[in-house]
UniProtKB/Swiss-Prot annotation:
Species, as recorded: Buchnera aphidicola subsp. Baizongia pistaciae (strain Bp)
UniProt enzyme class: hydrolase
Start and end residues of each PDZ domain: 268-359, 365-457
Disulfide bonds: C85-C91
Record's subcellular location: Periplasm
GO cellular component: outer membrane-bounded periplasmic space
Gene3D superfamilies per record: 2.30.42.10, 2.40.10.120
GO molecular function list: serine-type endopeptidase activity
Name of the encoding gene: htrA
Protein name (database record): Probable periplasmic serine endoprotease DegP-like
Keyword field contains Amino-acid biosynthesis: no
Family, as annotated: Belongs to the peptidase S1C family.
EC number: 3.4.21.107
């Protein structure tokens, strides 16, 4: 009994010793607050030393035309006759200048190529780029695409540029730490940090292609075109937009994923533009209600309601009722995501789609083809109305005119008085029920265009020359 007691006491003393020594060891390993902040391993300075020389500040100058229409209450029949009699336009315009600020990222140090947002350099007459060392240089636009809000500008004969290293945006995860670098409010290079709040965001502007990275890193006006990088200093996105009620940062910023940027810039450098692809489907978001009706366990993807005849989708065997859930083995978050990804690929790219059909996943290879334009960019047809996007206006399946989808501010179309949702039904006294009719008139290269336009309940003439 005495022997057992001695053994028990020995074991107890040993356990107490381990407990005390273990506690002391763990206590010594825990860094103090001072050591935490003094340690270089917890600073972003080393990363920023590599990245900041690749980010530039952009200053833009250009001309803008502001239009003012005579208020409707003063447009009585008598007043209209008086205005017409004296040749006074109902739409008054004045010329002015504008200045804009933005950021950019050096993609190619050898050729001086910089990527930025299309809206940063839109309507620019002069572009000045300031490098991180303070040197200023002139730049020119190589190409841009407003649908993706991407542009490439080029510096002339500038040496010793520092191009940024790229990451793979397909491997990003919500919660990853990120750093935003740009030129907010013209302050110069400014660094903020945060995390990835969400991926595959869309819906900010239904006219454009969107597949954004969302971040809470502070992004403000002037940050557009700047860099969003990971903790290795690799570029993961181009900062593009913020969601804000008053113009300031509220922790909701958006960046274009770098993989999409690479697809777009490759096309701009090769063709001077982005050649939009066509899959040839009509569809919608797959949500929980639709999934319940279809009796499937998938709640994200793109539901196909129609496949266009002889389109790449049709040729490849895709059918109405299919649900696209994978693109190149990556999950598809929404129809908007699929639309943006498809449009950004170079033409003739072969993609692999994961299709859910009859509750089974089937993989289909599709070769993309350039989209046959159902809309026209009028700048290709006639400089008199450049800046407007037009499409056929249909009622009960029949063409009844030409719809103005949107008009860029300050363009000839805007100065003429064209506005979004206008319906053009007559040009130079010729009835135009479709784009093909309109093209016939424009091919005569008229010096003046007289557009008969329906706007809401009003009918008006617009003259451009």
């Amino acid at each position: 009994m005495k022997k057992i007691t001695m053994i028990f006491n020995t074991v107890l003393i040993f356990l107490v010793f381990l407990l005390i020594s273990g506690f002391s060891w763990h206590k010594s390993e825990i860094p103090t607050q001072e050591k935490f902040f003094e340690s270089k391993s917890f600073s972003l300075s080393t990363v920023l030393e590599k990245v900041i020389p690749s980010v530039v500040s952009i200053t833009v100058e250009g001309n803008v035309t502001q239009s003012t229409r005579i208020p409707r209450q003063f447009q009585s029949s008598f007043n209209k006759k008086v205005l017409d009699c004296f040749g006074i336009s109902r739409c008054m315009t004045r010329q002015g200048k504008f200045h804009a600020l933005g950021s950019g990222v050096i993609l190619d140090s050898k050729n001086g190529y910089i990527v930025t947002n299309s809206h940063v350099v839109d309507r620019a007459n002069k572009i000045q780029v300031q490098l991180s060392n303070g040197c200023k240089h002139e730049a020119v636009v190589i190409g841009k695409d407003a649908r993706f809000d991407i542009a490439i500008i080029k510096l002339k004969k500038v040496k010793n540029l520092h191009e940024i290293k790229m990451s793979n945006s397909d491997i990003l995860k919500v919660g990853d730490y990120v750093i935003a670098i740009g030129n907010p409010y013209g302050l110069g290079e400014t660094v903020t940090s945060g995390i990835i709040s969400a991926l595959h965001r869309s819906g900010l502007n239904i006219e454009n292609y969107e597949n954004f990275i969302q971040t809470d890193a502070a992004i403000n006006r002037g940050n557009s075109g700047g860099a969003l990088v990971n903790l290795k200093g690799e570029l993961i996105g181009i900062n593009t937009a913020i969601l804000t009620p008053d113009g300031g940062n509220i922790g909701i910023g958006f960046a274009i994923p770098i993989n999409m940027v690479n697809n777009l810039t490759t096309q701009i450098l090769e063709y001077g533009q982005v050649k939009q692809n066509e899959l040839g489907i009509v569809g919608m978001e797959l949500n929980s209600d639709l999934a319940k009706v279809l009796k499937i366990n998938v709640h994200r993807g793109a539901f196909i309601s129609q496949v266009l005849s002889k389109s790449p989708a049709d040729v490849s065997g895709i059918k109405p009722g299919d649900v696209i859930i994978l693109l190149n083995r990556k999950p598809i978050a929404s129809f908007a995501t699929l639309r943006a990804e498809i449009a950004s690929f170079p033409i003739k790219t072969k993609i692999e789609l994961g299709i859910l059909r009859n509750k089974k996943v089937k993989f289909i290879i599709v070769e993309l083809k350039q989209k046959i334009q159902s809309k026209i960019d009028s700048s290709v047809l006639c400089k008199l109305i450049s800046g407007a996007s037009l499409s056929n206006f249909r009622i009960h399946g029949q063409n009844k005119g030409i719809c103005v989808n949107y008009v860029n501010n300050g363009t000839p179309a805007y100065r003429t008085g064209l506005r979004k949702n206008d319906i053009i039904f007559e040009v130079n006294k010729y009835q135009v029920s479709s784009l093909s009719n309109f093209q016939k008139v424009l091919k005569t290269k008229p010096l003046i265009l007289v557009l008969h336009v329906k706007r809401g309940n009003d009918v008006l003439y617009l003259v451009t020359h």
